[in-house]
């Protein structure tokens, strides 16, 4: 997929989301931190590595849409091979009773350290997460993501990761 197509899709999704969003911004002072631990690039046996990360969600900026609850996210992770990724993006929280389905998209900056060369500093993270909500302030879940630069350069191996998540609202 070309970079121009990716930008067009991102702008289209943003415009549609804002046009159908409920204009009321939630007034709660809730923030959510997601602490996660997992396996970076588990599908590449030579490059797979342990990763640890965090993600912040500010529910003061969330909006209810027909797609579910949409909110901005910011986070990052490091691997045991000193690779690092910092990102900011958007996630959709789809409430399914005591379960929450959360797809997200976040562009960010990647530093390979002694880890895998992903081919570019600008990378895009797409993720799906399924979590269980045992209480109003705590979720535990499992997530899968793919980090890739969408063919901005010739080399584009991408990385697939899975994580165990602990989410806490405060």
Give residue ranges: language-model regions.
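Residue-level signature of outer-membrane beta-barrel architecture
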Residues: 56-58, 92-94, 132, 146, ...
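Mid-chain, well-packed structural core segment of small domains
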Residues: 99-126
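Short loop/turn motifs that connect adjacent beta-strands in outer-membrane beta-barrel proteins
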Residues: 20-30, 44-45, 60-70, 95-101, ...
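Cleavable N-terminal export/targeting peptides
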Residues: 1-28
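Outer-membrane beta-barrel "beta-signal"
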Residues: 48-54, 157-170
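Solvent-exposed loop/turn segments connecting transmembrane beta-strands
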Residues: 40-50, 76-87, 114-121, 151-159
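Outer-membrane beta-barrel architecture
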Residues: 36, 53-55, 89-91, 129, ...
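Transmembrane beta-strand segments that form the barrel wall of outer-membrane beta-barrel proteins
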Residues: 32-41, 67-79, 102-111, 143-148
């Amino acid at each position: 997929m070309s970079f121009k197509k990716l930008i067009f899709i991102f702008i289209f999704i943003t415009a549609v989301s804002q046009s159908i969003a409920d204009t009321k911004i939630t007034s709660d002072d809730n923030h959510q931190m997601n602490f996660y631990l997992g396996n970076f690039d588990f599908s590449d046996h030579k490059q797979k590595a342990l990763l640890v990360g965090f993600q912040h969600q500010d529910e003061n900026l969330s909006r209810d849409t027909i797609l579910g609850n949409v909110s901005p996210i910011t986070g990052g992770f490091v691997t045991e091979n000193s690779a690092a990724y910092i990102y900011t993006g958007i996630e959709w929280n789809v409430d399914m009773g005591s379960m929450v389905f959360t797809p997200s998209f976040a562009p960010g900056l990647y530093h390979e350290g002694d880890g895998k060369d992903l081919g570019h500093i600008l990378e895009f993270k797409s993720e799906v997460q399924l979590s269980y909500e045992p209480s109003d302030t705590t979720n535990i879940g499992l997530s899968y993501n793919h980090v890739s630069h969408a063919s901005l350069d010739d080399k584009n191996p991408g990385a697939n990761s899975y994580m165990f998540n602990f989410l806490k609202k405060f």
